[in-house]
């Protein structure tokens, strides 16, 4: 009999998506969120990693990763490039140099058909990206890390069929983590390979957690509350010493990264266990987890609706709509940005999901 799926893991994915959007919204606690929120996704991917030592299994795994990660990366960045000139007319992007007065912003020029073709070729090999697709760095990193881990796993099982691969994978993860830390200090991250070296250890950490097992589901409530409180305290204690910016492969040190990531996992897992006991909340988080890719792709664009409404009410130059990632800070603006960044991609995802279900149903009857 198959082991029942842990509903908390579905909730964890949804919580991670909420934290990602919240971290981009101008929320005052973003530094705390950045300690662990992206590491959580690498660890979840490692937790669910499963592959036999057969060549066919490796091919299936690679094809699934291409369809689930590489293709959305290319299509999303290409779509944003195709829409570039339209976005310029709508002030979603701008060529006005005054935008440079706002930190982290850039001037954008019009593109030609030749530009679109050339840039799409670059997206195909993970060379660069678009501003509105800025969160897709994670998709690139996860694609590279998961394929590398699978190739190493396949090679180890072929070379040493009688031995457990966990120890050599752990040794490689440790070596790559050291390399990743050195790359971060040197500012080297060509094709995101510095991130790959650092993130490999987080992927392995997820595999290790799966192997060791989660706490018993019938664990006492006081024990779970204590674990969550301790994890929260550890993260608070780490906060004065720095934060984690995996998008740029920046973190204070390898031990800091591992401790923050592990503490974040414990905190989010215990929160997810609580959420899983509340059917409505659990369903909402599971829906967000299923829509993870649309949210990653569309939440920056969705923020523009909040900025546009703010400009209509408060007034301001049209070019300010292009402020990235958000125009307004302070007050409850972060709440409005977060709501838009979650709700609009989720709504946009529903027609695709329904169409896919109908197609699969028709194919099933054929």
Regions found by a protein language model. Name each.
Residues 1-366:
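Alpha-helical transmembrane segments and their immediate juxtamembrane cytosolic regions
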């Amino acid at each position: 009999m198959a082991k029942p799926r842990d509903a908390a893991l579905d909730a964890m994915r949804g919580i991670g998506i909420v934290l990602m959007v919240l971290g981009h919204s101008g929320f005052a606690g973003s530094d705390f969120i950045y300690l662990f929120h992206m590491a959580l996704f690498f660890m979840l991917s490692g937790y669910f990693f499963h592959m036999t030592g057969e060549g066919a299994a490796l091919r299936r795994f690679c094809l699934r990763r291409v369809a689930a990660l590489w293709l959305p990366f290319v299509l999303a960045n290409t779509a944003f490039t195709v829409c570039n000139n339209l976005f310029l007319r709508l002030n979603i992007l701008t060529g006005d140099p005054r935008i440079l007065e706002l930190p982290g912003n850039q001037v954008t020029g019009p593109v030609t058909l030749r530009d679109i073709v050339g840039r799409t070729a670059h997206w195909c090999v993970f060379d660069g990206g678009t501003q509105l697709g800025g969160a897709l760095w994670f998709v690139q990193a996860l694609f590279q890390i998961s394929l590398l881990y699978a190739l190493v796993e396949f090679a180890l099982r072929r070379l040493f069929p009688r031995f457990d691969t966990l120890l050599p994978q752990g040794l490689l993860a440790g070596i790559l983590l050291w390399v990743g830390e050195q790359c971060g200090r040197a500012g080297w991250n060509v094709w995101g390979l510095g991130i790959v070296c650092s993130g490999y250890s987080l992927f392995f950490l997820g595999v290790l957690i799966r192997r060791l097992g989660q706490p018993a589901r019938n664990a006492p409530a006081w024990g779970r509350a204590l674990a969550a409180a301790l994890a929260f305290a550890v993260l608070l204690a780490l906060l004065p010493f720095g934060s984690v910016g995996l998008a740029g492969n920046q973190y204070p040190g390898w031990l800091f990264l591992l401790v923050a990531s592990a503490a974040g996992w414990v905190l989010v897992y215990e929160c997810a266990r609580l959420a899983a006991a509340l059917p409505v909340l659990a369903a909402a988080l599971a829906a967000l987890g299923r829509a993870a890719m649309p949210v990653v792709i569309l939440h920056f664009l969705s923020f523009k609706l909040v900025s546009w409404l703010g400009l209509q009410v408060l007034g301001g130059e049209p070019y300010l709509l292009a402020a990235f990632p958000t125009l307004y800070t302070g007050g409850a603006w972060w709440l409005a940005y977060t709501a838009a960044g979650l709700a609009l991609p989720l709504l946009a995802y529903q027609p695709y999901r329904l169409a896919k279900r109908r197609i699969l149903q028709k194919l099933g009857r054929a």
